[in-house]
């Protein structure tokens, strides 16, 4: 017998019960984005490899270790996208969306990184990202953070996430800080692990991200990034904090917070949780005012964020399971006998016209009442509609509440109104 072919490690199937959860969460996210005036952009999964090398930085873990890169039949180097910002900027430049314009965009879809799979971290994962172009003040940074805070309230997880902020300043300020940090680390190399020693010269700010407790203790005495900020970045960050204070959004300034991608400047932020173990970052972003020009466009201020949907789904399931406890099916239509099947399907179509948001399944494949009600239970239906020959003749249908067991005969012409009352 042929060996079964299974999914690639770290790339998961999401089955119908799971996709229903994803759809509800995604619908909530998209509704909030729409309320802020953001528009969807759809981007390719595969891009030219130089796009990510130029945008992310060649000495980052993503480019050095994690990208899925291959040659196509023309010999061109292509990469499965590891993140969405670079592709969004590329599309904006290519289609003339950015120069001298204000854009609020969002995208959603799979990303790919060759990492060690674990809970909340996969090789194919899904991100929702939002990017704003053409606005340089701290007010738009604040709007993005307010938008994410509204998500948490809508999903019922606001008490389980917290906001961390930092400013990493201008390119020049970071260069000065980098020199000071490297000088400090060189004096304490005996405390550094091999990964930090490698990063010390290639990307020293990433040492601040180290999870090694000895390195973290050492960093308590390291130069502080905030002491090296340029005046404009300091003023920008103060303006952001003032706006968040006015909006009642709590935050912690974390001077060790940097981003893993090279294109960020000034504001960086993360929403973190203690409810998912080691995978604590739910949403992260910041400003990247130089990236558009770096990729061949004209200088354009920009800010954005990305959120891992796998982690968000896990978090909602962990702390607010009621949000996702909606039934897969609202109504199951039981048809008693083959002679009633046509009438049942006609009634079902009429109900779908009158109640387009209701999930309704019509029984197919026959079966007695016991089997059909068992199918209704399996689907998690709240209500069963029972249509037999007498109901067809009388123009009625029996409506049974599968939770209380109560049932009543209702005229087919008025059953939609009756169902709306039962379903709330």
Swiss-Prot record:
Lineage: Bacteria, Pseudomonadati, Pseudomonadota, Gammaproteobacteria, Enterobacterales
Subunit comment: Homodimer.
Encoding gene (name): hisS
Organism: Salmonella arizonae (strain ATCC BAA-731 / CDC346-86 / RSK2980)
GO terms, molecular function: ATP binding; histidine-tRNA ligase activity
Cellular compartments per GO CC: cytoplasm
PANTHER family: HISTIDINE--TRNA LIGASE, MITOCHONDRIAL-RELATED (PTHR43707:SF1), HISTIDYL-TRNA SYNTHETASE (PTHR43707)
Protein's cellular compartments: Cytoplasm
Keywords from the UniProt entry: Aminoacyl-tRNA synthetase, ATP-binding, Cytoplasm, Ligase, Nucleotide-binding, Protein biosynthesis
Major site of localization recorded for this protein: cytoplasm
GO BP annotations listed: histidyl-tRNA aminoacylation
Pfam families (UniProt xref): HGTP_anticodon, tRNA-synt_His
InterPro entries found in the cross-reference section: aa-tRNA-synth_II, aa-tRNA-synth_II/BPL/LPL, Anticodon-bd, Anticodon-bd_dom_sf, His-tRNA-ligase, HisRS-like_core, HisRS/HisZ, HisRS_anticodon
Family matches, as PROSITE patterns: AA_TRNA_LIGASE_II
Top-level taxon of the source organism: Bacteria
Catalysed reaction equations from the record: tRNA(His) + L-histidine + ATP = L-histidyl-tRNA(His) + AMP + diphosphate + H(+)
EC numbers on record: 6.1.1.21
KW Ligase (keyword) present: yes
Family label: Belongs to the class-II aminoacyl-tRNA synthetase family.
Name by which UniProt lists this protein: Histidine--tRNA ligase
SUPFAM superfamilies: Class II aaRS ABD-related, Class II aaRS and biotin synthetases
């Amino acid at each position: 017998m042929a060996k079964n072919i299974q999914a690639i490690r770290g790339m998961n199937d999401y089955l119908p019960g799971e996709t229903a959860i994803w759809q509800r969460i995604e619908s909530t996210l998209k509704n909030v984005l729409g309320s802020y005036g953001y528009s969807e952009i759809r981007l390719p999964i595969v891009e030219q490899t130089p796009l990510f090398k130029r945008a992310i930085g060649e000495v980052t873990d993503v480019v050095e270790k994690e990208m899925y890169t291959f040659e196509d039949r023309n010999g061109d180097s292509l990469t499965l996208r590891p993140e969405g910002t670079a592709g969004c900027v590329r599309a904006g430049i290519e289609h003339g969306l950015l120069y001298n314009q204000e854009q609020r965009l969002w995208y959603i879809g799979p990303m790919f990184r060759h990492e060690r799979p674990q809970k909340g971290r996969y090789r194919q994962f899904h991100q929702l990202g939002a990017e704003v172009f053409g606005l340089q003040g701290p007010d738009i940074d604040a709007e993005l953070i307010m938008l994410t805070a509204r998500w948490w309230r809508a999903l019922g997880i606001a008490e389980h996430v917290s906001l961390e902020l930092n400013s990493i300043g201008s390119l020049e300020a970071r260069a000065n800080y980098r020199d000071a940090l490297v000088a400090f680390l060189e004096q304490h190399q005996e405390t550094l692990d091999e990964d930090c020693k490698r990063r010390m010269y290639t990307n020293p700010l990433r040492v601040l991200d180290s999870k090694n407790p000895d390195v973290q203790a050492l960093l308590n005495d390291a130069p502080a990034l905030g002491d090296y900020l340029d005046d404009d970045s300091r003023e920008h960050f103060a303006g952001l904090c003032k706006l968040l204070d006015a909006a009642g959004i709590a935050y912690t300034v974390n001077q060790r917070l940097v981003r893993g991608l090279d294109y960020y400047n000034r504001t960086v932020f993360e929403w973190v949780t203690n409810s998912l173990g080691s995978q604590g970052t739910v949403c992260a972003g910041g400003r990247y005012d130089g990236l558009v020009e770096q990729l061949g466009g004209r200088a354009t201020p920009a800010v954005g964020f990305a959120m891992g949907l796998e982690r968000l789904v896990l978090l909602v399931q962990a702390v607010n399971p009621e949000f996702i406890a909606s039934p897969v099916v609202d109504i199951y239509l039981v048809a008693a006998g083959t002679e009633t099947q046509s009438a049942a399907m006609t009634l079902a179509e009429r109900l779908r016209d009158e109640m387009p948001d209701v999930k309704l399944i019509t029984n197919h494949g026959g079966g007695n009442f016991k089997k059909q009600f068992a199918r209704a239970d399996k689907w998690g239906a709240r209500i069963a509609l029972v249509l037999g020959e007498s109901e067809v003749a009388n123009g009625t249908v029996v409506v049974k509440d599968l939770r209380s067991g109560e049932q009543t005969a209702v005229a087919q012409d008025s059953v939609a109104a009756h169902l709306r009352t039962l379903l709330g």
